[in-house]
Amino acid sequence: NFYLEVAKMRAARLLWCRIMKGFDAKNPKSLMLRTHCQTSGWSLTEQDPYNNVVRTTIEAMAAVFGGTQSLHTNSFDEAIALPTEFSSRIARNTQLYLQRDCGLCSWVDPFGGSLLLEQRTQALVRQALDRIQEIEEAGGMTKALENSLPKRRIEEAAARKQARIDSGIDPIIGVNAYRPLVDLITPEIPLLKVDHEQVLKAQLDSLQTLRAGRDEVAVQNALRALREVARVMASDNPTKDQETKDQETNAEKTAGFGLMECAVEAARHRATLGEISGALEDIFGRYTAQPFSIQGVYAQQMAQDIHFEKALAAVRAFADEHGRRPRILVAKLGQDGHDRGAKIIA
């Protein structure tokens, strides 16, 4: 939604300014929201992929009109593979075209005063404050993350959106609307091919060269210092007396500022990212996500869909025969974090 995306940026600036004033910010520049935007990944389609050039252009325009300071435009083939130099150049030139040829960056907040945009902006501010209040009532963001509240809200919204797409309520050009005829299907586009074994070998060779040329004693000392700072932050013994607690509270404050500094110092001595992460894992442990599944959100949007009703009937028949619903393994490979598709299927 082009206008909604512009309004999001405007609402974010208003919220940031209001919140910073609440913290009694002394420097006026602290009231300025600095943002980096990236065009959508999940809006890109494998079907009729050249349409993605237009999608990315319009999404980039929304970010520019919204006042972003930094922008990344996705390549049109990223729904299929890593981008090629050809597709990356189109993505880069999209920004140059909007900036240089169209002059979109010449005016600050060009939609300011528009009745539509002002109303949408204020509505988003109110809705965002409701979400912030919900998080505060949950005990703050850390507690909300532990309870998967933001994650749940995101996945509920994604399921609702996907149901609207699958039911045809929300059109996706080239996918569920205005699909090309068989003889007009876009020809196969060139894709980037990656030799994973070669990439692995190159990385292992690079690490071997790195370790051979560094001061191992200095590296281990830096990692040891990182663990010590992390250990102070992690310590929490309720049996300690108040004086000891006060001393450790001061140490924790220092450690809070020093953790990043120690990590940077370790990197300066050529400790690897894995070694730095491993040192922190030694103290904090490894995070384990709490699995949960949302139910009923998708079905609400698909209640009148005949294909969905047939699927439900098939599941009921299976459950009657086997005493349980069917189980399907959804395996999301890789570590890029793009799990929307897997979550939607689940």
Regions found by a protein language model. Name each.
Residues 2-9, 44-50, 73-76, 82-86, ...:
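Short acidic, glycine/serine/threonine-rich loops at helix termini
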Residues 85, 93-96, 100-234, 252-309:
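Flexible, glycine-rich loop/tail regions that form catalytic "lids" or insertion modules at the edges
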Residues 1, 37-50, 56, 71-86, ...:
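Short beta-alpha connecting loops at secondary-structure transitions
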